C-alpha cells in the first residue's frame, strides 16, 4: 500500500495532539489524574500487554507466565512495604473494581452498608447509583456536619449501632480533610462490621506519610487507585492485614471481577512503588504544601475557597464555589479554553440534582507538583485563574500565558534519574510529540 488510510493518519494525529496538548501545554488540575515518570512509562509498553495470567502468581491457569509471576510478586511486595500492610492484591483494574471485590465479600444482596455521606465526597461506587447498587446492597449515609465539613462522629456512631451494617466505608472523591477512622473503628467492630477505607485519591499521600494510615487507625481493608496521588498507571489495588479477609477478597477478584488483569500495568506499578519508597515523602509533603498555597492564593485573588475556617485543605485538593461567577459548568469550561484543566463538582451543600451544573470546581495539585512546581507557581496559577474567571480577560491571551508558563515545567521529578535505558533495550519507544 503506497498511501496510508486517512483513518490511520487521523488516529496518529489525534494521539500526537493529545500528547502535545495535555503533556506540554496545559496546567492540569484534575485531582484524579497524574503522570508516570519516563522510567515507569518505558516499561508500560512491553510484551506483558499481550499476555494472560489468570489466577495468582505461581498458581496460574495459563502457561508462559514465569516472568508475569515474578513481576506481580515483586510489585505486591513493594506495595505491601510502602503501605505497611501484610497483604496486597494488584489485580483490580480500577479503584471501582477493587471496591466491588471487597463489597461483594463483605455483604450479600439485601444487606446494609453505612457510607460516608455524599456531601463528604463519597465516590459513586459507594452508592446505590454505582457498585453498591449493582450488588444489591442497601446504602445508608452517615450524618454530615457542615461546620467541620466531615462526618458527624457522634451521630454516625449512633447510626452504626442502630443499623448494624455489614460494613462501613470512609474515603471519597471530594476529599479535603481526613475522615474519622480512629473515632469510628471501635464502634464499627463492636457491631460485627468491617471498616473499608477507599484511599483512591490519597493513597500517594498515605504512603508518603503526609496523611494518616487507615490500617494503623482501625480500617480492616484499604482500596486504592494507582494513578492519582500515587503517580502510576491506571489501575486499582487492595491492601489489608486481615488474613481471612485477604483470602476471601483474593479469591473473589478473580474470577468474579477480572479475568485477565492487564499485566502491562505491573512493571510500571512496581517502579512507581519504588519511586514512592525513595521519593514519596518529599513528593507528598510538597503536594500538601502546594494545595494549601493554591487555596490561600485563590482566596487572596477573590475566589470563594471552601473550608477557609479549617485551613482550606489537608489533601491534594482545593474546592472553590463559583456560583457568583456563573456556576461550575461554565467556569470549568472557561478554564479549559485557557488551557487550565479542572472539573466541575458538587459542593457539600449542593443537591444531587445539581450534578450537571454544580456550585463548585474541584482542583488538585499532584500532577503539577510532579512536574516540579512549588508554592510560588501556585500563586501564579491562581492569578491566571483570576484573569479567566473574575477579570473576564480574553481566554486566548491567557492561554498563551499558560502555554508559555508550562514550558518551564516539562520534566517529571521525584524519580530515578541515573538509569540508562539503552542498557535494557535496543529500541526506545517514545511518545508521539
Curated annotation (Swiss-Prot):
Transmembrane segments: none
Pathway stated in the Swiss-Prot or TrEMBL entry: Amino-acid biosynthesis; glycine biosynthesis; glycine from L-serine: step 1/1
Cofactor: pyridoxal 5'-phosphate
Keyword list, A-Z: Amino-acid biosynthesis, Cytoplasm, One-carbon metabolism, Pyridoxal phosphate, Transferase
GO CC list: cytoplasm
Top-level EC class: transferase
Modified residues (N6-(pyridoxal phosphate)lysine): 228
Residues reported to bind (6S)-5,6,7,8-tetrahydrofolate: 122-124
EC number from the UniProt entry: 2.1.2.-
Localization in the cell: Cytoplasm
Site (Plays an important role in substrate specificity): 227
One example of a Gene Ontology biological process annotation: glycine biosynthetic process from serine
Primary subcellular site in the record, as a coarse category: cytoplasm
GO molecular function: glycine hydroxymethyltransferase activity; pyridoxal phosphate binding
Alphabetized SUPFAM superfamilies for the sequence: PLP-dependent transferases (SSF53383)
PANTHER family in UniProt: SERINE HYDROXYMETHYLTRANSFERASE, SERINE HYDROXYMETHYLTRANSFERASE 1
Matches recorded under HAMAP family: SHMT
Self-association state and partner proteins as the record states: Homodimer.
Task of the protein: Catalyzes the reversible interconversion of serine and glycine with a modified folate serving as the one-carbon carrier. Also exhibits a pteridine-independent aldolase activity toward beta-hydroxyamino acids, producing glycine and aldehydes, via a retro-aldol mechanism.
Family: Belongs to the SHMT family.
Protein name: Serine hydroxymethyltransferase
Protein source organism: Sulfolobus acidocaldarius (strain ATCC 33909 / DSM 639 / JCM 8929 / NBRC 15157 / NCIMB 11770)
Lineage: Archaea, Thermoproteota, Thermoprotei, Sulfolobales, Sulfolobaceae
Gene: glyA
